[in-house]
């Protein structure tokens, strides 16, 4: 059986977001921390925190919503894994996708680290498309 830790992370965030949870816990890794940093910087999550558990650690991701308690709206409308173990999706600097005509972001792993589509365009690097978030 194959496992995809990044797809698991995105699914946990998507599921918690759908039921308006305050936070969700995810097994930690360096790549997941970098993805959380991008989501926080771009305003899709409120915050994240690393919790030491004696093993690999846990990332507690605090989700973000608009509005009050009664009329809450989700900030994350969609989060999708693009490249996975069975089908890797690589793009060069000239073919970096725009998500929802610029309203969302694409998260890429590049030679310069984990970047958004805008950052990768500015640096002129391509890479593997991890996920789309809008």
Swiss-Prot record:
<dbReference type="GO" id="GO:0019843">
    <property type="term" value="F:rRNA binding"/>
</dbReference>
<dbReference type="GO" id="GO:0006412">
    <property type="term" value="P:translation"/>
</dbReference>
<keyword id="KW-0694">RNA-binding</keyword>
<comment type="similarity">
    <text>Belongs to the universal ribosomal protein uS8 family.</text>
</comment>
<keyword id="KW-0689">Ribosomal protein</keyword>
<comment type="subunit">
    <text>Part of the 30S ribosomal subunit. Contacts proteins S5 and S12.</text>
</comment>
<dbReference type="GO" id="GO:0005840">
    <property type="term" value="C:ribosome"/>
</dbReference>
<keyword id="KW-0699">rRNA-binding</keyword>
<dbReference type="Pfam" id="PF00410">
    <property type="entry name" value="Ribosomal_S8"/>
</dbReference>
<dbReference type="GO" id="GO:1990904">
    <property type="term" value="C:ribonucleoprotein complex"/>
</dbReference>
<dbReference type="InterPro" id="IPR035987">
    <property type="entry name" value="Ribosomal_uS8_sf"/>
</dbReference>
<dbReference type="InterPro" id="IPR000630">
    <property type="entry name" value="Ribosomal_uS8"/>
</dbReference>
<dbReference type="GO" id="GO:0003735">
    <property type="term" value="F:structural constituent of ribosome"/>
</dbReference>
<protein>
    <recommendedName>
        <fullName>Small ribosomal subunit protein uS8</fullName>
    </recommendedName>
</protein>
<comment type="function">
    <text>One of the primary rRNA binding proteins, it binds directly to 16S rRNA central domain where it helps coordinate assembly of the platform of the 30S subunit.</text>
</comment>
<dbReference type="InterPro" id="IPR047863">
    <property type="entry name" value="Ribosomal_uS8_CS"/>
</dbReference>
<keyword id="KW-0687">Ribonucleoprotein</keyword>
